[in-house]
Each structure stands twice: as C-alpha cells, then as structure tokens.
C-alpha cells in the first residue's frame, strides 16, 4: 500500500462495503498468490473470493475499531462462510492476529477495473485433469443449484466446472460464490463475454 493509496482513502468514500468474518493465513515459502506475486506474510494484503485483484480496501475490526488499508492479491477464504483471509501483517494491523477470527467491515475504495455488474458472469468452482471428477462435482452441484446451469469446458489438460446463475447476473454469481462450501470447489467469478 503506497502513500498515494493512503491519501486516496482519506479523501474518498468507499464504493462498496461488506461485513463478515476475517481470519489470517500464511503460506509455504515461495508460494505464489493468485495475482502471480510471491506470497509474503509481511505485506498488507488479503484474499477475497470475488473482488478484482489489486483492489484497494480498508478492513476495520468491528470489535477493536482497528483498521488498515491493504490490497487484494489472493483468492479465498475457502473455509466456512468467512469473508477475508488476511496476511499476518494485515491481521496484526487490524487486531485479528491474536484473536484468530474477528467480525470486520471491508470497504472497497478502488479497483483496477470498475466492478461491472453488467455483462455475463458465472462462478468457476473446479478445474480437473479427470473428466470423471469434473462430472462428479457437476452432479453434486446440480442437486444444490437446480436453477443454475452447470457446464464443463475442456481445456488443454483440464475440465472446468462452472455454475451459470439465472441471467448470467454478476450479483447472483457473487451470491453463489459466497454460499459454496469448500468441498464444493474453490469459487471465483469469471466473465462469459
């Protein structure tokens, strides 16, 4: 987070807010975050299931009032109904580190691209090298999301399982992504157009 980012936060209103649970995580040395950068416990960054990579956010611990600006650089959390995974530095800055989990408000101040509610969206929940495993997840999801169209995309070496919400609507896709359990796949939004 740069000095310019901190100045931007001071002089602008958030474009979107969410409340939920945050926890912290760490990763093996050398592991890359979803944005392609090497993960660092010392960076003020976080993981979110659907916000665009590079989004500038402020996380406020609703119990302690501590807050910090950070960037979205990774995908997650994929455990339970948590909203954010924080690096150790972010967790310490917001008072989440010692307690492990805390209720937070996430304020989005800037995204690399506007959060576009238009267009056609779906939720990708799995990528497999095995067609059988992709079919198994597809069948499991069809039982829970009968109104959604679950499709497979054969790639060079994988099959992708996606849930298409009614009308390919972004808000409906975000709702599905937030409700998916970890056993149902690691959900993230992707555009169809």
Pin down the residues of each PLM region.
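Secreted/periplasmic proteins
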Residues: 1-122, 127-139, 179, 191-193
């Amino acid at each position: 987070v740069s000095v310019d980012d901190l100045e931007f936060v001071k002089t602008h209103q958030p474009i979107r807010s969410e409340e939920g649970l945050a926890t912290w995580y760490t990763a093996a040395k050398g592991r890359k975050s979803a944005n392609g950068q090497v993960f660092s416990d010392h960076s003020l960054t976080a993981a979110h299931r659907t916000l665009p990579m590079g989004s500038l956010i402020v996380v406020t611990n609703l119990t302690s009032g501590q807050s910090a600006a950070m960037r979205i650089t990774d995908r997650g959390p994929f455990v339970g109904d948590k909203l954010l995974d924080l690096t150790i530095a972010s967790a310490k800055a917001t008072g989440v580190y010692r307690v492990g989990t805390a209720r937070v408000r996430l304020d989005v101040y800037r995204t690399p691209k506007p959060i576009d509610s238009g267009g056609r969206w779906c939720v990708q929940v799995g990528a497999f090298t095995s067609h059988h495993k992709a079919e198994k997840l597809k069948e499991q999801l069809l039982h829970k999301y009968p109104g959604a169209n679950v499709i497979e995309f054969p790639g060079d070496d994988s099959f992708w399982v996606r849930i298409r919400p009614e009308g390919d609507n972004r808000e409906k896709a975000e709702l599905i992504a937030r409700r998916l359990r970890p056993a149902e796949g690691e959900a993230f939004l992707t555009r169809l157009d």
